[in-house]
């Protein structure tokens, strides 16, 4: 909010934050689906932790099903979906089969890393566009 120049001391009607941390993957997907189906004019959904919508990030079938669900939501509700998935420790590859599927289907993949010169700064680079 601060980076966008928006006030941080009051709620905004056009931003809705939903915490699904304690929900199962199936329940989280149901909640997202319900919200998309019952709210109007949603233009952007940010899923910080796409891994939390899966039981097994290395399952090819579960990965494909989740990617298909994201694509369905994107098309059906005419919105952009931004997901966050961490990289493998030690290399620049996204984690699990879901990482491979996201890379294959994503419009743009961005990598966010801490600056080597200042740990208080994050650097963003395009892995592919």
Q: Residues of each region from the PLM?
A:
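Conserved inter-motif catalytic segment of the P-loop NTP-binding fold
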Residues: 1-61
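Phosphate-binding/switch region of NTP-binding enzymes
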Residues: 44, 52, 61-129
């Amino acid at each position: 909010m601060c980076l966008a120049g928006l006030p941080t001391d009051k709620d905004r009607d056009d931003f809705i934050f939903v915490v699904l941390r304690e929900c199962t993957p199936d329940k989280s997907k149901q909640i997202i689906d319900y919200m998309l189906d019952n709210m109007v004019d949603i233009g952007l959904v940010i899923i910080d932790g796409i891994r939390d919508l899966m039981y097994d990030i290395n399952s090819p079938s579960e990965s494909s099903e989740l990617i298909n669900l994201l694509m369905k939501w994107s098309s059906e509700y005419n919105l952009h979906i931004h997901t966050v998935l961490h990289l493998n420790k030690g290399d620049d590859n996204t984690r699990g089969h879901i990482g491979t599927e996201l890379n294959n289907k994503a419009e743009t993949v961005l990598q966010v890393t801490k600056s080597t010169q200042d740990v208080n700064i994050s650097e963003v680079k395009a892995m592919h566009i």
